[in-house]
């Protein structure tokens, strides 16, 4: 039984003792931790126990994610059912109900995708310079939390010119993209100065891995390409929680069948311009490639013929971007009587969340 709920607040620093010193996330910027810090800070200000303050941090993280997700859904317009479905994937809420900065990163990712969908599907929307600046600014913030998703800034090049009010739209977009990439390089160099002495992966070395790829590209580039092509297979991990030891494999088929039906219910409802379909597809594939390359360089032993460390949650943003593209590929519109209502999408997602909660609790208590 934990004594944290009886433990009062203190400024005294103590050593880790027998606990594991696992400070391995300090290369992320502070923005991803604002909700958690705010919740814990309120508990500390009110002189609540450490346990209550700890859970306040988690609750504030969930609230922050829900707010960001609601904004993304609102922005998505005709694609709001798909965005709702993705935003309510249990993995999102599991991450949000912790101190993980992924909740803010994912919420921001969905907002950026929602902005893009609004720009290309809203007939009344006219893209102005301020819209481009906002989009680029959000991508800069995202770089500090989910670096591979910096490639979302490339979607600016795939907004039809007729949707804009800018005389030199593509020139301005290109300048913004270059600026974001320059910041990305700066941020990457800055984070490489962080040295986590107590957290080292045996055999992994970025410089050594790059040398291997350059010296024998015909050996190692296919390894990365293979991982990119197999990325879909990692989506089953969206229902594997904890330390990848709490699986819901027994109910995966009906859950994914429901998601498929909801997706196809939106066929014909969403119509992205052809150039936007091409752009979203290219950017999605590039993000998958950058994720695979990043993990191969940083998480995989030098010379290994398999990319290690890949988890399905890394592709949540890609899923949110790809689903509207899939629906745009089909011309035939689904009859109204065969469509799902917004209420049904939310209700079914809540049922899946409830199943996840029951499964997790039952497994944890069974282990105890």
Language model: regions and residue ranges:
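Interfacial juxtamembrane loops and adjacent helix segments
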Residues: 1-56
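Transmembrane-helix signature of polytopic, membrane-embedded enzymes
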Residues: 48-51, 70-90
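Specific aromatic-rich, kink-prone transmembrane helix
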Residues: 71, 106-124, 135-138, 325
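Membrane-interface alpha helices of multi-pass inner-membrane proteins
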Residues: 94, 128-147, 152-158
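Short acidic/glycine- and proline-prone juxtamembrane loop motifs at membrane-interface regions
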Residues: 98-105
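Perimembrane helix-loop-helix junctions
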Residues: 117-126, 150-179
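Membrane-interface helix-loop-helix junctions at transmembrane boundaries of multi-pass membrane enzymes
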Residues: 164-171, 262-286
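Membrane-lumen/periplasm interface segments of multi-pass, membrane-embedded glycan/lipid transferases
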Residues: 185-269
